[in-house]
């Protein structure tokens, strides 16, 4: 992994250890996606986090909120000292699931928690910006398991029907529900719903950047979708092999072990 991919994972591990909470497998599967969006793709800056013309990032798979804080720390919106000192504490703004009401200055765009709600929220933002004729683009990160929710497919129908080519749905396809529900070919399903779809390696930052740029350049009144092929716990051998890390925070000894694995990856 490149240095920034390692740093983001190290910081996510540290924050999880500090608050003794977090879904680290899910976090590690999407960190590269979130970083590429903020660093290479989105029209967004910490200094203008409330600008009307900004791009929006909606995290629908809220269990991966610990993937968002390290990225926003790197982009200068938060400090590691502030986040690590308060994350997960009672009434803290740094919740394990995002809470936009605690960030009046911007930076967090949605409340997360109930799965299947981020996409309809993102569709509403994209539709409003389309009506206002704003240049804003909306990106929404969803887990593959969220497509068990009917709200996801209802939102896809609406997005295609309203010709929201300012919307990009990103599916973190880490195959977390395959043992329970066969999701089939997600690319074919989304294409049938009227999306322009591309599949890519969700851990290859160059490939992600190219895919996002190619889709954004297409103005054809069709919403976009990226199927990002990912691995749960990517960057840590222990987390990829042991599903207990879906929802487990490291103690001091485990933190050292996992950080060493990330550094060696």
Where on the chain are the PLM-derived regions?
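N-terminal capping segment at the start of a domain
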Residues: 5-21, 172-173
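Cofactor-binding active-site loop characterized by glycine-rich and histidine/acidic residues
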Residues: 15, 27-161
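Generic beta-sheet signal
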Residues: 55-57, 136-140, 167, 220-228
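Short acidic, glycine/serine/threonine-rich loops at helix termini
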Residues: 69-71, 151-153, 179-183, 235-241
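A short, conserved beta-to-alpha structural element at the edge of catalytic cores
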Residues: 109, 161-189
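Conserved thiamine diphosphate
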Residues: 134, 182-211, 263
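A short alpha/beta connector and helix-capping loop motif
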Residues: 149-174, 223-228
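Glycine/aspartate-rich loop-and-adjacent alpha/beta segment that forms the canonical ThDP
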Residues: 205, 211-265
